[in-house]
Amino acid sequence: AIAAIIIFLILFTIFGNALVILAVLTSRSLRAPQNLFLVSLAAADILVATLIIPFSLANELLGYWYFRRMWCKVYLALDVLFCTSSIVHLCAISLDRYWAVSRALEYNSKRTPRRIKCIILMVWLIAAVISLPSLVYKGDQGPQPSGAPQCNLNQETWYILASSIGSFFAPCLIMILVYLRIYLIAKRSHCRGPRAKGAPGKSKFKQSRQVPGGTLASAKVPNLAAHLVAAGETNGRSKPTGEKEMGETPEDSGTSTLPPSWPALPNSGQDQKEGICEASLEEEAEEEEEGEEEREEECEPQALPASPASACSPPLQQPQGSQVLATLRGQVLLGRAAGAASGQWWRRRTQLSREKRFTFVLAVVIGVFVLCWFPFFFSYSLGAICPQQCKVPHDLF
């Protein structure tokens, strides 16, 4: 029964990892450089299933090493090599996730296939260094039953502890710390949201909406009503185009006026009243980003200028990339600024969201993998620390 289960696991491992390699190599959407880690990891698992597990199963069922002595040394070295490579691959993937989440735009520009291949090569070199002593140094292999050749790893305490730390405990500690750091970054980003000071793409202008009274007004234009009211004085006289307002800020002086080709506001008379809403930019920006309902203040009726040209005289603050239109009913439409900084910020936000989802999936996979390996390495190390008092039963091991 145990042999049948092991054979099924061997076939399942080969088939599943072959599908992973085939999917990454054939699917255009999976040809990202970081997926090369999955190809190398799947190759290591296939090598474990084909070159290690069958011989381990035969050794357990027969009770002795049936094959040649030279193959025993190669088998032990490959066992440590492939298993260590599999674990260190997961450690490298976790570091790649951390760099992608903490430095999304900067790291993604450096995440080239050449760089990923160099990291994979380093992973295999680390695994080779850890597995080399079992090939060149025989050491103490423990008691050997008479007439029954055995194939065991070096039983010396220093080798057991060194190989266990290098193959499992050190990579496991790195993975735990890295994923803890990723969790803290995600939690801080979720609590802060896009409200970070100086975040690119945070525009002060928003698409206009209909307000009571049939008038369109922008909720994100600071002091819009003050500009329009100041333009039309009680005598109906408009200022010259190039003249500045009293108390005009330096920011206002650098902005341009509406082009003359745009439709002008109609002459609606001195007594015509329209509702123009004044809203605080800071309060509404905070409420919008915290997910709360946007608060609107009651509209105060203000007199529109009697002269059509007077509405175009005062300069409106218009950021680069925004749209300002004047309709036939005298309604001002302000579009959201869509500059390069805004696009960069949204690309970073999308990239972070995708990396966090992928990180969660990998955290589950790595967690299961660590739980499967921990009992073996714990009992293996425990037997070296206290071989007599803490001896683990052979069947359990």
From Swiss-Prot:
Protein name: Alpha-2B adrenergic receptor
Intervals, Cytoplasmic compartment: 26-36, 96-117, 181-361
Subunit structure: Interacts with RAB26. Interacts with PPP1R9B.
Keyword Membrane: yes
Record-marked site positions (Implicated in catechol agonist binding): S163, S167
Membrane topology note: Multi-pass membrane protein
Biased composition (Acidic residues): 280-300
Compartment annotation: Cell membrane
Disulfide cross-links: C72-C151
Family: Belongs to the G-protein coupled receptor 1 family. Adrenergic receptor subfamily. ADRA2B sub-subfamily.
Annotated segments matching region Disordered: 193-212, 230-319
Compositionally biased tracts (Low complexity): 301-319
GO cellular component terms, A-Z: plasma membrane
Organism annotation: Talpa europaea
Site-annotated residues for Implicated in ligand binding: D79
